[in-house]
């Protein structure tokens, strides 16, 4: 069979022949125009990356056996290590969140055997035993792999039942050990095995697990935490494990792994990484590095600036604190909330701003340009930051307009640097110009420069804090919650704010979740499939319900790429499966919990709110304009990932169900022991019992006014509460005091009104007509029943010889009887009573 461009030919179709690589184009080697092998070298490999063509297969193997990715008969797993798939996946930029179509097909070709075996737990265990030793890529991040390992060979796992951490899944099977490349400089014991599969690091205690429907989990044995990496195969092939924060913690990561944050100067790196305690670090930052801007690197999104804070009051220069009615009181309330949540002393590191402010000063909106010597420190040019264009930062002659960032990935230009693998960008000239940029100056929060600063105030998307245990947390002003970001500062410099971009995906026991302040589980992600996983929809075509049909759907020709046009990509999937995308989004939106406005939250008047258009002008909902149906936590993560500065929550704190923390303790750095901190957090989590936390919210819904706080940080409860959310809900009012008792006058007629207060003693029962003994009493009624019953209605008129004048006179008399005024009109004489009927003995009828 002839070869094309020196590469192997296209594999056979799905289901034909042994080791088929999927549909047309799946698993095939990319052409030379798509993958420039000569321009890219895989870091850490000793052998040449150029593969040897093997006729008849898309994956280069020695003695082919089984599906792509299976180990050869010799036991040396060199098929993927020296194959084109590893070379292709090594070129994914760290800023990109999703894989392209070619990279997606390469991931599917390697994981095809595991996908087809994902029918039952028994089948998955047999697959892990049969393919033990196989090395499979994790997609993102580069340099991490899954080594297929039977459970009996996993040290320390034992009889752990992962279904206790994920009750929704019918079965979860541990199938592989997570390993990664090692930097020989960080670990001299590796030696010559740095570029060999045997030199991979497996000391992190991370294991890969698969559940029903190809749900992918990462199990952290040390912390007993189950992390949801992907909800289905399509999400796993598209995003990989790049959202798992735990992967970036190891300090022995190789040079081929995603690069970490490039600090401005080596002295600042030493200050952050070698600080023995938070107190000394805080003094050093305030003395020398206050106002310095750091280009923070977060996997899966573009660079964003983080301004190091010298004092907590500096946050008043950023939104949403600057526009608050009283910024100082709001900052006091937020500081009080952080004391209650962290239960120890803490240090404010910096404020994370949107990416458009990178290269501009981060301060009040003065609109003036500050010279380089005004404030701040001189920084070094960071390689690989072309998406943010550091070449025109503050202090240079060229200014940069704020660049909006759309879909993840975009047209990022990445260049090789000391801390990253080599990647070929779309424009080599622009990459070379970015790499050769002169050193820049980052100006602190005392001045403003650049067109992004004119007339606007930067918004703090996150406030990074460091507690006494060395863990890094992020306070989110969008929803007022505190989220864990990293276990230590070195981990934070590699993972960035990734912990806030994947909320609700970590499940741990109650004690572990309380110790690490893990957010609540996102039930929408753990218990429901993805809304855009259309091949799992109940109304999808019948052929898409089998594994082979789903495989053909995911890897069909010309499916498209969701990076550039996600709407067209989803519309194509919906048409293929016979679904209406607008209907699917509308149904999923209706299943989300409705918004809630607290009873003590003051609403804006209707004339200050944006009125919806009349029904005649409302357009039909379209999938291109509808917002994605995301849960509350997923919506916050989406806003933080794409720097949505106009995002507002839909709900406020539930006043009746929220838990109010009354702890007023003030913790000082260095005065608490680690065991005491853990005990305080566990005690508060036990008292809260999973309820929502009553907290200050700097950003409130659109129809509400901002919260107000006292100088001590306590919220001011308004005297005039808002109306209930639902019209049919009965409002609660204070009970009015009862009237004083009045002199009783026995009426001739039964009472017409209900008595709400304490009244005179009840009247003796009247003798009923027709009674013989005169001792029959009326039925007794409870006091509650008397208050709830309505007054009896007047009897219907009898149209005999009565006239309209008589009826009017009777109605007027009844109205006067119901009047409660002191002056009563004399009543007319009562009509004569009818004669009493003679009582007769009952007749006995004999049948």
Curated annotation (Swiss-Prot):
The keyword Cytoplasm does not apply. Its main location: virion. The keyword Transcription applies. Residues 1-82, 607-627, 715-847 are annotated as: Disordered. Residues 723-733 have a biased composition (Acidic residues). Residues 833-847 have a biased composition (Basic residues). One of its GO terms (molecular function) is protein serine/threonine kinase inhibitor activity. Residues 26-56 have a biased composition (Low complexity). Keywords: Host cytoplasm, Host nucleus, Host-virus interaction, Inhibition of host innate immune response by virus, Inhibition of host interferon signaling pathway by virus, Inhibition of host PKR by virus, Interferon antiviral system evasion, Transcription, Viral immunoevasion, Virion. Residues 16-25 have a biased composition (Gly residues). GO terms for cellular component: host cell cytoplasm; host cell nucleus; viral tegument. It is found in: Virion; Host cytoplasm; Host nucleus. One of its GO terms (biological process) is symbiont-mediated suppression of host type I interferon-mediated signaling pathway. Interacts (via N-terminus) with the viral DNA polymerase accessory subunit UL44. Interacts (via C-terminus) with host EIF2AK2. Belongs to the herpesviridae US22 family. This is Protein IRS1. The gene is IRS1.
């Amino acid at each position: 069979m002839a070869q094309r461009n020196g590469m192997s030919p296209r594999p056979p179709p799905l289901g034909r022949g042994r080791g088929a690589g999927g549909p047309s184009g799946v698993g095939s080697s990319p052409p030379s125009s798509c993958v420039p092998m000569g321009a890219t070298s895989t870091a850490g490999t000793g052998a040449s990356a150029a593969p040897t063509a093997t006729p008849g297969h898309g994956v280069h193997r020695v003695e082919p056996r089984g599906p792509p990715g299976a180990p050869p008969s010799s036991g040396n797993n060199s098929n993927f290590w020296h194959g084109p798939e590893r070379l292709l996946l090594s070129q994914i930029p760290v800023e990109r969140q999703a894989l392209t179509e070619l990279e997606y097909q390469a991931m599917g070709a390697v994981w095809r055997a595991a996908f087809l075996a994902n029918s039952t737990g028994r089948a998955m265990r047999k697959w892990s035993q049969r393919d033990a030793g196989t090395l499979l890529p994790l997609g993102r991040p580069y340099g991490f792999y899954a080594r297929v390992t039977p459970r009996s060979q996993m040290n320390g796992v034992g009889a752990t039942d992962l279904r206790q951490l994920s009750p929704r899944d019918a079965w979860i099977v541990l199938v592989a050990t997570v390993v990664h490349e090692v930097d020989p400089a960080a670990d001299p014991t590796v030696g010559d095995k740095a570029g060999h599969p045997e030199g991979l690091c497996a000391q992190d205690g991370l294991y890969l697990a698969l559940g029903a429907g190809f749900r992918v989990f990462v199990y952290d044995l040390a912390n007993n935490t189950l992390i949801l990496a992907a909800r289905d195969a399509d999400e796993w092939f598209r995003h990989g494990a790049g959202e798992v924060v735990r992967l970036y913690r190891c300090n022995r990561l190789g040079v081929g792994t995603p690069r970490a944050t490039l600090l401005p100067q080596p002295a600042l790196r030493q200050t952050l990484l070698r600080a023995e305690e938070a107190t000394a670090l805080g003094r050093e930052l305030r003395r020398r590095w206050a106002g310095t801007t750091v280009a923070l690197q977060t996997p899966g999104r573009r660079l964003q600036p983080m301004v190091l804070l010298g004092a907590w009051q500096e946050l008043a220069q950023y939104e949403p604190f600057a526009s608050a009615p009283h910024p100082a009181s709001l900052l006091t309330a937020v500081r009080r909330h952080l004391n209650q949540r962290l239960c120890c002393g803490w240090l404010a590191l910096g404020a994370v701003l949107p990416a458009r402010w990178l290269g501009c000063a981060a301060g009040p909106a003065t609109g003036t340009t500050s010279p380089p010597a005004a404030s701040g420190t001189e920084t070094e040019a960071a390689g690989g930051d072309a998406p943010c264009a550091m070449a025109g930062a503050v202090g240079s002659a060229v200014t940069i307009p704020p660049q909006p960032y759309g879909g993840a990935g975009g047209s990022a230009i990445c260049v090789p640097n000391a801390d990253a693998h080599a990647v070929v960008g779309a424009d080599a000239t622009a990459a070379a110009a970015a790499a050769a940029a002169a050193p820049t100056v980052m100006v602190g929060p005392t001045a403003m420069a650049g067109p992004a600063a004119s007339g606007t105030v930067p918004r703090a998307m996150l406030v990074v804090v460091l507690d006494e245990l060395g863990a890094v947390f992020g306070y989110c002003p969008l929803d007022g919650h505190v989220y864990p970001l990293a276990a230590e500062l070195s981990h934070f410099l590699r993972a960035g704010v990734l912990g806030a971009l994947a909320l609700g995906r970590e499940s741990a026991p109650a004690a572990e979740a309380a110790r690490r302040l893990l957010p609540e589980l996102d039930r929408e992600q753990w218990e429901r499939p993805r809304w855009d996983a259309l091949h799992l929809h109940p109304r999808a075509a019948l052929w898409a319900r089998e594994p082979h049909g789903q495989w053909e759907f995911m890897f069909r020709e010309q499916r498209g790429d969701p990076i550039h046009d996600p709407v067209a990509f989803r519309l194509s999937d919906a048409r293929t499966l016979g679904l209406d995308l607008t209907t699917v989004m509308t149904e999923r939106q209706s299943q989300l919990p409705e918004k809630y406005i607290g009873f003590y939250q003051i609403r804006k008047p209707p004339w200050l709110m944006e009125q919806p258009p009349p029904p005649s002008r409302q357009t039909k909902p379209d999938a291109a304009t509808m917002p994605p149906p995301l849960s509350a936590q997923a919506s916050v993560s989406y806003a933080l990932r794409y720097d949505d500065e106009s995002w507002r929550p839909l709900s406020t704190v539930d006043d009746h169900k929220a838990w109010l923390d009354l702890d007023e303790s003030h913790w000082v750095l260095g005065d608490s022991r680690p065991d005491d901190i853990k005990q305080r957090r566990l005690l508060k989590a036990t008292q809260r019992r999973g309820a929502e936390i009553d907290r200050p919210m700097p950003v409130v819904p659109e129809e509400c006014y901002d919260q107000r706080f006292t100088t001590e940080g306590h919220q001011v409860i308004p005297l005039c509460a808002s109306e209930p959310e639902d019209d049919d809900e009965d409002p609660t009012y204070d009970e009015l005091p009862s009237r004083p008792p009045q002199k009783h006058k026995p009426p001739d007629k039964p009472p017409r009104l209900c008595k709400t207060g304490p009244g005179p003693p009840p009247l003796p029962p009247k003798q009923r007509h027709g009674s013989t003994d005169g001792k029959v009493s009326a039925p007794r009624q409870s006091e509650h029943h008397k208050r709830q019953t309505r007054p009896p209605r007047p009897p219907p008129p009898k149209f005999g010889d009565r006239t309209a004048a008589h009826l009017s006179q009777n109605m007027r008399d009844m109205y006067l009887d119901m009047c409660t005024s002191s002056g009563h009109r004399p009543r007319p004489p009562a009509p004569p009573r009818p004669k009493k009927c003679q009582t007769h003995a009952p007749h006995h009828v004999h049948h």
